[in-house]
From Swiss-Prot:
Keywords: Early protein, Host cell membrane, Host membrane, Membrane, Transmembrane, Transmembrane helix, Virion. It is found in: Virion membrane; Host cell membrane. Belongs to the asfivirus envelope protein p22 family. It is a single-pass membrane protein. This is Envelope protein 166. Residues 1 are intravirion. Residues 23-170 are virion surface. The chain crosses the membrane at residues 2-22.
Length: 170
């Protein structure tokens, strides 16, 4: 006798749940899509794999770069345009990544941004996904290396090395 009433109530409840579900999906703010960090400047976030995020540089690098292996003593990095920048870090030369090291030799500049100069040299090389600048003396003299293997293995080094690994840009 009460069976049809129960069916109607269940039907009404299901309709309400469906309406609320569609309303929630429609009014949920979409994730902001980006191509560069400047697309995310409104909240101080960075662009990682096409989405604005407030993750630390190290967490972003782990998410962004497939199969990256970092020495546990590496605790931070910096976002740079197109690269994750690691200080006091070098490639593990025993790894497949380290074995692709291309020595560009000693470089020097007069504009005190030697690591950026090294980066620009490596960007000109086809297939380069990383660069390393090892400062030999104050005044802009150091060795520049490029890397082509896409599975970075990084370890701590002396305080004069700077390593850059390309960020994935969608």
């Amino acid at each position: 006798m009460f069976y049809p009433v129960v069916q109607v109530l269940i039907g009404i409840i299901l309709v309400i749940i469906l309406i609320l579900g569609f309303y929630h999906m429609k009014h949920k703010p979409p994730k902001k899509k980006c191509k560069t960090d400047t697309d995310c400047k409104d909240k101080g976030h960075h662009c990682v794999r096409g989405t604005c995020t407030d993750k630390s540089c190290l967490e972003a690098a782990k998410q962004d770069i497939k199969d990256i292996k970092l020495d546990p003593t590496i605790r931070s990095c910096d976002y740079a345009p197109g690269f994750y920048r690691f200080n006091a870090t070098t490639a593990d030369l025993q790894s497949p990544f380290g074995k692709t090291r291309i020595d560009l030799g000693r470089v020097w500049t007069t504009w005190s941004k030697e690591d950026e100069y090294c980066q620009s040299l490596c960007l000109q090389r086809k297939g380069s996904i990383g660069w390393e600048f090892d400062e030999l003396s104050l005044g802009g003299v150091g060795n520049c290396y490029c890397y082509t293997n896409s599975h970075p293995v990084l370890k701590n080094s002396n305080n004069t090395t700077v390593m850059g690994i390309a960020r994935n840009v969608l």
